[in-house]
Design a protein with these regions (language model features):
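Bacterial signal peptide processing site
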Residues: 16-20
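N-terminal cap/lid segment of alpha/beta-hydrolase-fold proteins
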Residues: 24-42
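Conserved HGGG/HGGXW glycine-rich cap/lid loop of the alpha/beta-hydrolase fold
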Residues: 39-92
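Active-site loop/oxyanion-hole signature of alpha/beta-hydrolase fold enzymes
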Residues: 84-125
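Conserved hydrolase catalytic core segment
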Residues: 120-157
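Flexible "cap/lid" loop of the alpha/beta hydrolase fold
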Residues: 149-187, 224
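Conserved serine/cysteine hydrolase catalytic core
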Residues: 176-251
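Catalytic active-site module of serine/aspartate enzymes centered on a nucleophile-bearing elbow/loop
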Residues: 244-246, 252-280
Length: 280
């Protein structure tokens, strides 16, 4: 993989990434919707549906949350409460303080949920960078999280392991592409996030976990990238090992943005984890 092909595929890697059978335990009957102050900046959250646990949707880097989860959220709302929010600097949320690391993002999400009155238990569904944030949130608040769905999630070892596959030029172009996003997240922020998540993963709780993986290979310009695909699969398997019984499910017809390509697969995974969480 060389030149433009390397840049194209790795810019993609920066992006995102019927009713249930068991009756839903009762949750708040008036879901919040609006902007709440989080450490001096407004953050938007909107919840739909009723029931527990509450599903919290986490989007990829610089990706609009509404479009990412457009087909997923209404389907999930039919069997439990589901909340979508805009990270600081995105859509209806105001920019937050620097640096923009996973630690900062998850702290803001936790504070936002508290301000909005969205109480645990939670099931987290995180796409791409949102999957990394979900890993950190669950590790830092294990008593509040009852399940996790990782949607083609990033992994804290991706950055250091992928660069040798690219060569000097490809690695440089990748860093530039990753630093160009609507959230103001820098490449340095992403490396710091890797360290934060890597250090926290040992505390990931033993909860139901499904790691969804894209099934359509990255082939920018028609050029296959088997080395990247092999690494990606290894990292998804490692993500699944965060929890006993965690497993990888391949979305055969999807590129990186599985929630947009195969929303039914994402909804099915969330439903399964919610059902398991209710049985715990």
């Amino acid at each position: 993989m060389r030149g433009r092909a390397a840049l194209a595929v790795l810019a993609v890697l920066a992006g995102c990434g019927g009713d249930a059978g068991t009756p839903a335990p009762k949750a708040a009957s008036t879901p919040p919707a609006g902007t709440f102050d989080v450490d001096g900046h407004g953050m938007f959250i909107e919840c739909k549906g009723d029931g527990a646990p509450t599903v919290v949707l986490e989007s990829g880097l610089g990706v609009d949350s509404t479009s990412t989860w457009a087909a997923v959220r209404p389907a999930v709302a039919r069997f439990t409460r589901v909340c979508l929010y805009d990270r600081a600097g995105m859509a209806a949320s105001e920019p937050g303080p620097k640096p923009r690391t996973s630690e900062a993002m998850t702290a803001e999400l936790h504070a936002l949920l508290g301000k909005a009155g969205v109480k645990p238990p939670y099931v987290l569904a995180g796409a791409s960078l949102g999957g990394m944030n979900a890993q950190l949130f669950a590790s830092e608040h294990p008593g509040e999280v009852k399940g996790v769905v990782l949607v083609d999630s990033l992994h804290p070892d991706l950055d250091r392991r992928i660069e040798p596959l690219l060569g000097r030029r490809g690695a440089r172009e990748r860093r530039q592409a990753l630093g160009q996003n609507a959230e103001g997240v820098t490449y340095t922020d992403l490396l710091a996030s890797d360290e934060q998540v890597r250090a926290a993963r040992a505390d990931f709780p033993p909860v139901p976990l499904i790691a969804l993986e894209h099934g359509i290979s990255f082939e920018p310009g028609g050029e296959p990238v088997p080395s990247v695909e092999k690494l990606w699969g290894e990292l998804q398997a490692d993500n699944a090992r965060l929890s006993p019984g965690g497993r990888v499910v391949v979305a055969a017809k999807s590129h990186h943005r599985i929630a947009e390509d195969e929303p039914d697969v994402v909804v099915g995974a969330i439903r399964k984890v919610v059902e398991q969480a209710r049985g715990r």
